């Protein structure tokens, strides 16, 4: 397995995932069909066999995402290329999107030119194009009639049918426009919610993450019955999490996926499944939360636990991380790397997420130590055969170079002694810092107690304290601080001697 990703850091890895006005993964759709071409983006080649079974995996999805996922697997996986592309061709022929059928046939011809499916079915193409043109003309003619009659409900339904037609044939730009035109003719909250979800689905397929987020906010802000809002919440949170994942906002994405209600079930399978929520949310949380947050907000979360039960290896990885068992955690993630590299939404974030999780693991491992041998670290963080770990303390080894890189960019506050083969922490003495904080707190406590006693004695004596001028008050406060700091200095000196 050889991920063909740029090595210029997270910025380069995520640069093609910044929110776009249109297109998917930073690629503009075809102006005629609205299709997103992936040929311009560097593909991640996956040589290893994934753990999932293709038919069972794709059966969890509905709608256009089935083809998109099959096509991605077929063009990225050496092991599943032929089977996935054959399934993608069959999926395309079950619909009316001629352009995606031609793409799938071309992709199969590149890897297996002798397969029967690698030849274009010209009759089907011609027949489908005629059907699509006739259907488009009919729907547009009906919509013009509705507009002439000025019946709002008919106009809304006409735009909806036209948008669904454009979406089915892959003209995502026209589908987006048709759904957007429904806005002025929606008369009930349920109509508005239905329209916004259709726009969100098209925006997700286009990779238009700004539009996904803006329409999610509209869904959240619109009124409606409490039961309707509760029904929409899971899909809203999942869509928002997906847009934040693609934007590289992993902590926000984790929060959104964790907030997704388990009632999501299979209601959003045209975009993602409950298993996807568990994987996306778990990986984003591992990459962005500390151990306390992971334990409290993920493992102890009774709601998100329902998702984690669908992907128990994610739950185990998080548990191992929280218990400082970093090697088993990293081994689990590495075992599922091929699966995640074949996921349409996760693929180009896998390297960034894995790097962050690994860096966090190294940081957490070093916290209790002032000095640790490189060999003992290699036993935990160098995955693979144990026989290869003995040479990992060498200055030219990949592991030592990784540590040097983390030290140079300020991630690790440490230095490496290559002569003794140890990593030495340069952090300050935590005990002295705690002692200083306690003594400062004691100073504040003594001063506060003195002021309270003084006020109590003044009131008991029946004296009246008139407001002081600003200058005199400042001088008295400074004099009081000097007197009370002497107590703190004495305690500090005594404490240091002890």
From Swiss-Prot:
PROSITE patterns: PCI. GO terms for cellular component: COP9 signalosome; cytoplasm. Gene3D superfamilies: 1.25.40.570. GO terms for biological process: cleistothecium development. It is found in: Cytoplasm; Nucleus. InterPro entries: PCI_dom, Rpn7/CSN1, Rpn7_N, WH_DNA-bd_sf. Component of the COP9 signalosome (CSN) complex that acts as an regulator of the ubiquitin (Ubl) conjugation pathway by mediating the deneddylation of the cullin subunit of SCF-type E3 ubiquitin-protein ligase complexes. The CSN complex seems to link protein degradation to sexual development. Required for fruit body formation. Belongs to the CSN1 family. Component of the COP9 signalosome (CSN) complex. This is COP9 signalosome complex subunit 1. It comes from Emericella nidulans (strain FGSC A4 / ATCC 38163 / CBS 112.46 / NRRL 194 / M139) (Aspergillus nidulans). The gene is csnA.
